[in-house]
Regions:
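Short active-site-adjacent helix-start/loop capping segments
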Residues: 29-30, 56-59
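The feature captures the LRR N-terminal capping module
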Residues: 1-19
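A generic local structural motif
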Residues: 5-6, 33-37, 112, 127-128
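Surface-exposed cap/linker segments adjacent to membranes
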Residues: 1, 24-27
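Consensus positions within tandem repeat domains that build extended binding/scaffold surfaces
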Residues: 38, 58-61, 81-86, 104-109, ...
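Extended Gly/Ser/Thr-rich low-complexity repeat segments
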Residues: 27-44
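Structural signature of tandem-repeat unit edges
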Residues: 16-25, 42-56, 66-79, 89-102, ...
């Protein structure tokens, strides 16, 4: 299954449950109750792979993909939108790439299985609610110094 949306193409491999996003620039934003192009296969998505060239993950892009366990993000990514991975209840750990600058409010809200997050030195702004209601989150690794954090 393949589809193109503005500057972004997506494809889904049913055997692996992998949704691959390719393109350049910013991903579209969606409203909280607006259907994304992959809405019909949302419950089958086990892995999201965003390729080099993409600079953002749009608002609500992968919201409520409850089978999503793995996310691969490129070093070209600089922005994670509001609710971008909200309600991804099977997601266990996230390594944010060097290059990301902004993580918006509730980007990982209610990711109840999320245990570990790695934050890069490039991070400039993280909303205090980015990981709200992630009760299992017990490990946050920052790859910079204390002075860089402040």
């Amino acid at each position: 299954m393949n589809e193109k949306l503005n500057n972004v193409e997506w494809s889904f491999t049913q055997e692996t449950g992998c949704l691959t996003i390719t393109g350049t620039g910013k991903m579209q934003n969606w409203a909280e109750h607006q259907e994304r192009p992959w809405e019909e296969i949302r419950d089958e998505i086990r892995r999201v792979r965003i390729c080099v060239g993409m600079e953002s993950v749009g608002d609500c892009a992968f919201q409520n993909c409850t089978s999503l366990k793995e996310v691969e993000l490129p070093e070209t990514l600089v922005y994670l939108g509001v609710y971008s991975f909200r309600g991804c209840t099977a997601l266990r750990d996230v390594k944010l790439p060097e290059g990301i600058c902004i993580i918006c409010a509730k980007a990982f809200h209610n990711c109840s299985a999320l245990e570990k997050v790695e934050l890069p030195v490039s991070l400039k702004n993280i909303d205090m609610r980015a990981f709200a209601k992630d009760e299992a989150l017990h490990t946050v690794i920052y790859h910079g110094t204390e002075a860089q954090w402040e």
